[in-house]
């Protein structure tokens, strides 16, 4: 209920229940935010700031509006609703759909994936551990009626951990000649995606159900997602998952560094690892293919080059960055 009608409905229900039935009508009360316009003003026909939810549903879908309201339903604050917000969460639905298309394109089998194989590939261990951690967070937040935090947990894991990182990292394996690793990636990527649909179903039931039935996850195609039990995943976080975190950290820092210097994110660079510690140097050498692909690196050098370089610090290690010859470092710094 909204706080503005607590006395008119909630309080009276409690009074009537205790007076006539000698018991409270309910144990828990969830007081949600009021939905206002993007400036925080109360919606009014006279002000002309009323947003018709039916128009938003028609334009962006019921799931997009539903997920928007859930994500913004923080305790103690009103929802400042705008069309751009709903549009942003519609893009999230598109991201989910595109992830499904990626699995189809890479010939993933949607049947018989209730169990995952023994994990040998590091990125598979990492995403499975992230899934376990996210599941625990969502369960805790739902139990605490923090629907906004639960929605954000699901959003962050799906968009960033799974789509932005895991699927991108998996491409280096899917395009390799290692058939065993490719098969493991196919099975794990499909298994995790299946669990993502289960996690997201309370928030966006229509699109998740559509994908579930389309892929026939239950082997028959007639068992609805809404009938499935909640998932239980045990974390397997170890040194191998830490290695993946290290890769992500290095690539993220490289991208941020380019952005800070106003350099095109698509530009290629050379980096020198001459000044970093021995363990990190060995780690980078063993993960050179992935780092080059996602970091857009031409060469990873053991020695410094005799030309101007920008310096970047990652976890205490000093990297020297060499840009294309047409990039003027003096102009960048200005």
Where are these regions (language model features)?
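Catalytic cores of enzymes that engage adenine nucleotides and/or redox cofactors via long glycine-rich
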Residues: 21-39
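Short helix-adjacent coil turns
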Residues: 142-149
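Acidic, turn-prone loop/beta-hairpin segments
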Residues: 37, 70, 110-136, 168-252
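Short alpha-helical scaffolding segments that buttress acidic/His motifs in well-ordered protein cores
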Residues: 6, 14, 29, 64-72, ...
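Core structural elements
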Residues: 91-104, 122-134, 152-172, 312-317
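C-terminal low-complexity, glycine/proline- and small-hydrophobic-enriched intrinsically disordered tails
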Residues: 87, 214-334
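Catalytic adenosine-cofactor/nucleotide-binding cores of aminoacyl-tRNA synthetases and other
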Residues: 35-39, 43-118, 217-221, 260-269, ...
